């Protein structure tokens, strides 16, 4: 996949890219990509292989440890995660991303308002992260367009053919 090789190339040169003042004015921080396709098509495996090839840890986000029913706690958890990831140089892997990056709704009650605030906060943190963020989903249409507009690479993982499965 050429798209995956583009990710590897970015990782190889990310320090130079992130430290170049001229480039900083022209391009977004970090690299964001979306892996989408049916279950079992290699999205998680590909994220792991990207990490292995680049000698980087892939941190799979456990949504149960991030999302909280208490107001403001989800944002605190996300802040801790992103601060730690910056220091550790992790690849952040959001599996089943549609559950956290879903389309925002019109505000009907306070619950909708807080959900939309969480989405906006997450959008800002991802935008400011100078490393690699991979979102993986089986439900691409459910991802908020504000996220998809900021993604540099969108990679489809189709069901492999019989011949591809033998490889």
Predicted regions and their residues:
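Walker A/P-loop NTP-binding motif of AAA+ ATPase domains
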Residues: 2-167
């Amino acid at each position: 996949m050429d798209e995956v090789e583009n990710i590897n190339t970015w990782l190889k040169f990310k320090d130079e890219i992130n430290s170049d003042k001229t480039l900083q004015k022209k391009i977004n921080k970090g690299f964001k990509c979306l892996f989408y396709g049916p279950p079992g098509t290699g999205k998680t495996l590909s994220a792991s292989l990207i990490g292995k090839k680049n000698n980087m840890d892939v941190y799979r986000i456990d949504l149960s440890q991030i999302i909280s029913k208490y107001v403001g706690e989800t944002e605190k958890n996300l802040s801790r995660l992103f601060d730690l990831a910056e220091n550790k140089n992790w690849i952040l892997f959001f599996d089943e991303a549609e559950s956290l990056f879903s389309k925002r709704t019109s505000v009907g009650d306070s619950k909708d308002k807080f959900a939309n605030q969480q989405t906006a906060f997450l959008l800002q943190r991802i935008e400011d992260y100078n490393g690699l963020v991979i979102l993986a989903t089986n439900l691409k249409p459910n991802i908020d367009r504000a996220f998809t507009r900021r993604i540099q690479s969108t990679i489809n993982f189709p069901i492999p053919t019989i011949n591809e499965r033998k490889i």
